[in-house]
Amino acid sequence: MFGKKNKAVTFSYDDGVTQDIRLIEIFNKYGLKATFNLNSELLGTDGSLVREGRVVNHTKNKPEDIKHIYDGHEVAVHTLTHPNLHKTEDDNEVLRQVEQDRINLSELVGYEVVGMAYPGGGKNCDKRVAEIIKNNTLIRYARSGDVTKSFEPFDDLY
């Protein structure tokens, strides 16, 4: 996969927040690339999160700005509305959350989006969800936020 090298460093950021604009400026300055995992139905919404006791802006970039903001970087699926897919009992809803987000994002960026990050952090997918995605969408890889404490590449791309 990586020629003679067998390890890689990746940068991956979730939710399509306005802070990505500054982050991308820094990445571009130093010739770095990243993947940005977006929820197409949440684009353009205001929000905030509490992190380490501080309120942090979590406002999403607007749909009409996505192509320009993320140009030169990968955009990937993060589902339409950020549900915990392994807790979503309806297989059709899992499929809708993933494939419709992929279609929406592909239209916004002008190329086929084929990557995905499961929403929710930690161990946030199961075999059922992975099989739905693998067998019914155009997604070619999906990653979890699960902490492995290992630098070993995954055997299964879903």
Please state what every model-predicted region is.
Residues Y30-D126, N136-T137, G145-Y158:
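Metal-dependent polysaccharide deacetylase catalytic core of the NodB/CE4 family, i.e.
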Residues R22-I26, R128-I132:
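A short acidic, amphipathic alpha-helical/loop segment
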Residues G3-K4, L108, I133-K134:
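Structural motif
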Residues D20-I21, N84:
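Generic hydrophobic alpha-helical membrane-span motif
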Residues E131-N135, R140:
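Short, low-complexity, polybasic intrinsically disordered segments
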Residues M1-F11:
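N-terminal pre-catalytic segment of deacetylase/amide-hydrolase enzymes
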Residues V17-T18, T81:
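Short, glycine/acidic-enriched loop or turn micro-motifs at the edges of active sites
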